[in-house]
Amino acid sequence: MTIIRKKHPLIKIINHSFIDLPAPSNISSWWNFGSLLGLCLIIQILTGLFLAMHYTSDTATAFSSVAHICRDVNYGWLIRYMHANGASMFFICLFLHVGRGVYYGSYNMIETWNMGIILLFAVMATAFMGYVLPWGQMSFWGATVITNLLSAIPYIGTTLVEWIWGGFSVDKATLTRFFAFHFILPFIITALVLVHLLFLHETGSNNPTGLNSDADKIPFHPYYTIKDFLGVLILLMAFMILTLFFPDILGDPDNYTPANPLNTPPHIKPEWYFLFAYAILRSIPNKLGGVLALILSILILALMPLLHTSKQRTLTFRPITQTMYWILVADLLILTWIGGQPVEYPFITIGQTASIAYFAIIVIFMPIAGMIENNILDLD
């Protein structure tokens, strides 16, 4: 068996990636989220495939086909709710995975980090298009509002929006193309994940100390396979509790009303995992400025390696930057809350303050904190 595992051209790739991979001996549970994201992606692709067998991407029948899946298809309700809540679990793992990368300075592995940012954008695009497919009120109006933002692009904006819509409003053509893209993107994401792993295995994993761990490596299997399996069990437990007991808790009641272009819902808002970016978008009175801030709220992650001023890689031994980091986490939670609130006083002011704080902490305060720590420790 060992001979096959190490010699077979296909199996040896798996062997070098998941079995004989040298891994740092001290990586904590924060390193579990990569495998959990892989699991989420597999769940989403499988449930999505079975949903696509029964779904129809036509404005006249889309809403009814989802109702048909839930009522008439064997375990259709389970597949549908697993897919809907699977997206939420996916984003929880994504945010924790990115948060881990920021905390432990993993952004210094630039190729892996940039690939991760591309993956984040791809997953967000996929989730947005997926939300449009049930063709409820929030699906329709969410698609209208978000695609309309592209009209802020000078000169080509209006043409671009009509090209994406396939007409003069969100309609049948839009739904059909969104379904096509929503179906194909997860497979593209899978390919990008392999590239992400390829880049990671070029450098090896980071660890909580941020120090070189070449002198103290252990094989991935059995140590981290068993550790990942525990993470998988906990994730599946939480996932099934959410899906079976509270399937609609993260959804919007408006999406149980069929899409009606003549009736605007009182509060148009995206799914919870986009609320922080939506709050930043709404905080800027100018349309183009809002769109740029929205894109920058994610793209700013690409600047992280350039903004790293500390002589130490991780925040493990850096209490000042740690404080900044946790203020940033709190700020993101505030933005998420504000994104779900109506556009009125005091929420507008809170949102604007939190948006300024978000960019200021990353661009100004964390780099300054790093320099102060260098000074305190005489690392200059």
Curated annotation (Swiss-Prot):
Keywords: Electron transport, Heme, Iron, Membrane, Metal-binding, Mitochondrion, Mitochondrion inner membrane, Respiratory chain, Transmembrane, Transmembrane helix, Transport, Ubiquinone. It is a multi-pass membrane protein. Binds 2 heme b groups non-covalently. One of its GO terms (cellular component) is respiratory chain complex III. PROSITE patterns: CYTB_CTER, CYTB_NTER. Heme b b566 binds at residues 97, 196. One of its GO terms (biological process) is mitochondrial electron transport, ubiquinol to cytochrome c. One of its GO terms (molecular function) is ubiquinol-cytochrome-c reductase activity. Gene3D superfamilies: Cytochrome Bc1 Complex, Chain C. Its cofactor is heme b. The keyword Ribosomal protein does not apply. Heme b b562 binds at residues 83, 182. A ubiquinone binds at residue 201. The chain crosses the membrane at residues 33-53, 77-98, 113-133, 178-198, 226-246, 288-308, 320-340, 347-367. It is found in: Mitochondrion inner membrane. SUPFAM superfamilies: a domain/subunit of cytochrome bc1 complex (Ubiquinol-cytochrome c reductase), Transmembrane di-heme cytochromes. The keyword Disulfide bond does not apply. The cytochrome bc1 complex contains 11 subunits: 3 respiratory subunits (MT-CYB, CYC1 and UQCRFS1), 2 core proteins (UQCRC1 and UQCRC2) and 6 low-molecular weight proteins (UQCRH/QCR6, UQCRB/QCR7, UQCRQ/QCR8, UQCR10/QCR9, UQCR11/QCR10 and a cleavage product of UQCRFS1). This cytochrome bc1 complex then forms a dimer. Component of the ubiquinol-cytochrome c reductase complex (complex III or cytochrome b-c1 complex) that is part of the mitochondrial respiratory chain. The b-c1 complex mediates electron transfer from ubiquinol to cytochrome c. Contributes to the generation of a proton gradient across the mitochondrial membrane that is then used for ATP synthesis. Heme 1 (or BL or b562) is low-potential and absorbs at about 562 nm, and heme 2 (or BH or b566) is high-potential and absorbs at about 566 nm. Belongs to the cytochrome b family. This is Cytochrome b. It comes from Microtus townsendii (Townsend's vole).
